[in-house]
Amino acid sequence: RLGTWIGGDRDGNPFVTLKVTEEALKIYSNQIIQIYKEKIVNLSESFSISTLYADEPRLLMSKIKNYSNLLNKEYRHYTKINFDEPFRIFLSLVFHRLDNFQKNKKGYNSFSEFQDDLNLFENEVNKCFKNNSSSLDLRYFIDYVNQFKFHGVEMDIRENADVLRFNEDFKKEYSEFTTLIKRIPEWKKIYGDTVISSIILSMTKNEKDILNLFKFCKKLIKNKSDIPMLVPLFEEIEDLEKSHVIISNLFANKDYKKHLTNFNNNQEIMLGYSDSNKDGGIVTSQWS
């Protein structure tokens, strides 16, 4: 797993807006999709097998036919030059759906659509070929895709607890953070369910801060399984010293404990003792 908070760290940085976060997600997505496109080209050469020498993949041919409207120009081109190579035709059409992702209606609407196409392709390969050296390469690629999805890296969203304490000084930040949280389910659908791995709450002072964030997310996110891991970041000496008590109190909340079942009952925490800008000072932070 690769993670980043570049594009998602809003704490104290007014330049990290919702637009910046969305642009960062697109940049990461474009990078991983470029890798997928290159691999699809290689696989299409490996599976350039004529139906004269293999069973006809009927489900795959049906899906190719379904793509004749969406990818009409591409469909006519590949069915003409590779007329007896359905596996190659299908992967060529998959390439164009990847190439048009987030550009126009020809592209995939979600990661799950791409995943379904790959699973269909693999199932048809396994039915039509008993022993094919390229099948293992295909399986490795699908495992790779299932790991990195359409996001490549998992982004952390980071915000200061003061924003959720209804402080008048943070009205603008509160409003934009609200809009961002609402977008998480959409991002998960487009890029894959692990695109936003966690929401980090800096300057967490007590369990109420995390429970406040939890309540905030429940109000804005319809499907509760779409709520990411909520991570307290303890930064000041007093908060670090009582962090174990705060976590124990947090776990005592039944609703929150149920939320953790979505993460195999794991809870991430962050310790900010290395930050010399907090009350511990530079000597304490370096000593730690």
Model-inferred region functions:
Residues 1-2:
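Extended, Lys/Arg-enriched charged tracts that mediate electrostatic binding to polyanionic substrates
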Residues 7-10:
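Expand to "…catalyze enediolate/carbanion chemistry for C-C bond making/breaking, isomerization
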Residues 223-227:
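A conserved P-loop NTPase coupling/switch region
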Residues 12, 149, 232:
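Conserved, mostly hydrophobic/aromatic
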Residues 18-42:
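Extended active-site and interfacial segments that coordinate phosphate-rich ligands
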Residues 45-190:
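Extended, charge-enriched "interface" segments that sit outside catalytic cores
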Residues 130, 135-215, 219-222, 237-287:
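Active-site cores of enzymes that catalyze phosphoryl transfer or operate on phosphate-rich substrates
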